[in-house]
């Protein structure tokens, strides 16, 4: 999969049990692009998500798309544009049919996975024991990530977190343990 779109990067590939296809989600400028494949070699573009949804104050990157119960969650890391400046992870809850992600919230709603400054580039692990969804972030922020007092070290991973979903006043949110 190639493109001339700026910031076309960070592919996440996963097996979609519902459609019996591989899906790939990647950042493409200010949106996410979704592809499907039967064989991991030949990819078909399916759709984009993001225009008009959430925060667009920075570059969208490091996407993830996870099934949680009967809903899907799209993680979108953004830099800058976090609630306290610099990097952060926003997320969208909705439905995914293997071809298109549809957000259940209004386009103006922005949901943050974490409000701390040192949580970015969150990724999840597939097939964790007992069906758990485990995520791990990069424990840093691009506001100062290049200004650490070492030459090679650029911070560390954050603590693994188990993700879940809960509902409050008609909206779905991620819970973190």
What annotation goes with each model-predicted range?
Residues 1-177:
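Carbohydrate-active catalytic/glycan-binding domains of CAZyme proteins
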């Amino acid at each position: 999969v190639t493109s001339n779109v700026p910031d076309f990067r960070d592919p996440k590939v996963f097996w979609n049990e519902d459609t019996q296809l591989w899906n790939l989600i990647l950042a493409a400028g200010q949106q996410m692009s979704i592809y499907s494949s039967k064989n991991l070699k030949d990819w078909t573009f399916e759709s984009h998500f993001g225009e008009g949804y959430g925060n667009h104050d920075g570059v969208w990157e490091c996407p993830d798309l996870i099934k949680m119960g009967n809903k899907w969650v799209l993680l979108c890391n953004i830099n800058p544009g976090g609630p306290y400046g610099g990097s952060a992870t926003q997320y969208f809850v909705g439905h995914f049919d293997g071809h298109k992600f549809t957000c259940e919230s209004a386009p103006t709603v922005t949901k943050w996975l974490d409000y701390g400054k040192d949580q970015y580039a969150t990724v999840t692990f597939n097939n964790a024991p007992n069906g758990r969804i485990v995520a791990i972030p990069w424990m840093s922020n691009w506001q100062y990530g290049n200004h650490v007092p070492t030459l090679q070290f650029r911070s560390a991973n954050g603590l693994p977190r188990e993700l879940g979903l809960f509902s409050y006043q008609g909206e779905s949110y991620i819970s973190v343990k």
